[in-house]
């Protein structure tokens, strides 16, 4: 019963919150103006971010300090079982939220077996529809399981953990292209900022720069490192220390494009790819630990 109440509360909050709503601003202010003791407590827990190896596709798992779990995309269909196995290895038998960034099959295909086999409290979607069989199968499985399905709004906050700010910087409303409709998330825990770009392209980057602060320590590079994303101007505004490139080895698309890799190198950004292994990160809000690379202080 407690779990059901939590889901209903989250759904009602998401339906009400938007960038300009007074309730959203009060909610976020309560997070960032907490008492000194409360702010100290938030750093006792860690936020864990796993950029999963799913071949030519995208899937990111986030375990928040309060234990809530959020999966962002699931890779292609054949990666679904791989993701499920990874969740089991981490002791996860339930997902509090799935974020479906946009309807391309290399992002939502793997969500089909995940939704079939694992309890999910809520699915957050870009709002972009598509005519593909993969998309219709995905939606039908959600309906069959009776999982709440919400299209997010730009500027909206996703209140899964009171100590973590998760803001939507882009959605699929009124967007023609699937990639342009990608949900973009900025996640902040303490001093640690993660910017997850989905398949957002340069046009989306330009729009985001007009509205939001994009500075982040970790940039999940847009569209698998394609030349259509990650402009010079955008990199300068984000100023990341670390860049994650999600792609499969020997993929037919040439991802990541050498022009993007070159730009990231020129800015001295440390790059990690999911082509060979899952990239694991942890942060206490003060430092970031990357796999076996050890503790990395945040440069603020």
Give residue ranges: language-model regions.
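Non-globular, low-confidence helical/coil segments that flank catalytic cores
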Residues: 2-8, 16-300
């Amino acid at each position: 019963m407690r779990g059901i109440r939590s889901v209903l509360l989250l759904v009602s909050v998401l339906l009400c919150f938007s960038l300009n709503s007074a309730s959203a601003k009060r909610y976020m202010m309560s997070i960032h103006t907490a008492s000194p003791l409360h702010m100290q407590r938030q750093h006792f827990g860690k936020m864990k971010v796993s950029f999963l190896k799913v071949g030519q596709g995208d899937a990111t798992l986030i375990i928040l300090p309060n234990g809530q779990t959020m999966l962002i995309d699931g890779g292609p269909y054949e990666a679904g079982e791989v993701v499920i196995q990874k969740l089991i290895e981490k002791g996860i038998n339930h997902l509090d939220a799935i974020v479906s960034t946009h309807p391309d099959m290399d992002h939502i295909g793997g969500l089909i077996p995940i939704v079939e086999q694992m309890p999910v409290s809520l699915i957050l979607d870009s709002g972009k529809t598509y005519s593909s069989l993969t998309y219709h199968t995905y939606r039908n499985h959600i309906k069959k399981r009776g999982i709440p399905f919400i299209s997010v709004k730009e500027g909206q906050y996703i209140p899964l953990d009171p100590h973590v700010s998760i803001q939507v910087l882009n959605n699929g409303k009124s967007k023609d292209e699937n990639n342009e409709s990608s949900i973009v998330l900025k996640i902040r825990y303490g001093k640690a900022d993660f910017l997850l770009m989905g398949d957002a392209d340069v046009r989306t980057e330009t729009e985001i720069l007009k509205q939001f602060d994009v500075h982040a320590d970790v940039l999940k590079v847009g569209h698998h490192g394609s030349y259509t994303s990650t402009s010079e101007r955008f990199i300068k505004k984000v100023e990341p220390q670390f860049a994650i490139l999600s792609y499969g080895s020997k993929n037919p698309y040439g991802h990541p494009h050498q022009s993007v890799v070159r730009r990231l190198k020129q800015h001295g950004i440390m790059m990690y790819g999911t082509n060979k292994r899952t990239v694991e990160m942890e942060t206490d809000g003060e430092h970031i630990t990357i796999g076996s690379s050890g503790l990395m202080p945040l440069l603020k």
